[in-house]
Amino acid sequence: TVKILSGNRLYFAVHKIIYAILGGFIMSDYQSMDKNALESELKNLKAEYEDYKAQGLKLNMARGVPSTAQLELSLPMLDILKSDSDCLSVSGADCRNYGILDGIDEAKALFAQMLGVKPENVFIGGNSSLNMMFDTIACFSENGVAGEQPWLLQGKIKFLCPAPGYDRHFGVTGFFKNIEMITIPMTENGPDMDMVEKYVENDSTVKGIWCVPKYSNPDGITYSDETVKRFAALKPAAKDFRIMWDNAYCIHDLTDTPDTLLNLYDECLKNGNEDLPIMFCSTSKITFPGSGVSALAASKNNLDVLKSRYKFQTIGYDKLNMLRHIRFFNNYEGVVAHMQKHKAILAPKFELVISKLTKELGDKNIASWHNPNGGYFVSVNVLNGCAKKVVALCKEAGINLTGAGATYPYGIDPNDSNIRIAPSFPPLDELAKALDIFCLCTKIAAIEKLLDK
């Protein structure tokens, strides 16, 4: 006997058959699925997950480490200085010997262009800008700045921390036990400036703020012109408030439509606030991490304070390495041309990340991300309460990610939602598999969260 269905009953019967045939793809928004559909989807996803676990994979997307191919771009630099090389700087200084506390002139000229300041505002350091940031905080903590008492003698002080942000920044200020870190939410234009202004201009215990202004770590956001201008126009309640402007990705573009960052130092000069910023960068992700050259830029007042410490700390940093870098690049244009080679290696990896996220998660309503024009990371926000679960699932399947919460002060993500993806190190084939597993784990964690509601 054939039973004829009509009206709504016919519609729902047909819909049910089609849904069964297509495996639920009609309703791909997980937050719109009913319990039965979610449970069915979860069963299939877990079976796929067990298959990956059985493969015994060891894949790494934890940190922004340049790949072997990127490191090989700078190998010719190792041949620049040989036993018969002239080791004199442009000023005639013998780079093999002691001296020149703030670095050779040609290095200061190059980094001045990278940071957008004059050479006299530049201090050349060793192989690590993070080291210079730590030394700066230590100097102000132990010796003070702007004629004020050392921070260590001022009791509990505060440092503003835009988040998600760079975990090693938070590690530096977290090391100093009298510094309380205050989370400032990031927006699409940079830190929440209403909140920044409220803290800085009304609380004299607020002494500084961390910033990665171009291609921020991990969001890949570049601060808007308005944000930079508001930083430059700050009227701090504390004379010794300083902006730690870590311009780590100042020339690390990935697309043909790169972001542009307004020059903070120029804007500060317009406002009579040239003492506000301490600016940093390095060649760590340009040549060899750990064997590069770092630099900071600041006003004369700030440099005088910093040099008063550095003159006891060192006689001068590695001038041969400075010379090697300068002769390898020749000039700023040489650095820019070199970065195009990095772009050729990195861009396909970032394109793959965005493609995989869009294909696997784009219509699931369980994750969001920013498509950066440069930098080293893609920041993914999964459903609230799921980041730790996703990272744990990935680890069990052999995928190493930055720890959930690491992008927030004290390692505490209030929403447990942010995950940083670092695609630079793995080869494309390994990256593709790691991303497949990441997306799979994101789906599993999301469905389990939705079923728990």
Named regions from a protein language model:
Residues 28-102, 106, 112-113, 396-399, ...:
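N-terminal "arm"/small-domain region of PLP-dependent enzymes with the aminotransferase-like
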Residues 266-347, 360:
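Conserved core segment of the aminotransferase class I/II
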Residues 26-28, 35-36, 41, 87, ...:
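PLP-dependent enzyme catalytic core of the Aspartate aminotransferase-like
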Residues 60, 340-354, 366-381:
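Conserved glycine-rich beta-strand-loop-beta hairpin in the small C-terminal domain of fold type I
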Residues 93-239, 250-272, 387, 439, ...:
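Conserved core of the PLP fold type I
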Residues 9-26:
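Short, Lys/Arg-enriched N-terminal segments with co-localized hydrophobic residues
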Residues 45-53, 302-303, 307, 313, ...:
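Conserved C-terminal alpha-helix-loop-beta "cap" of PLP-dependent enzymes
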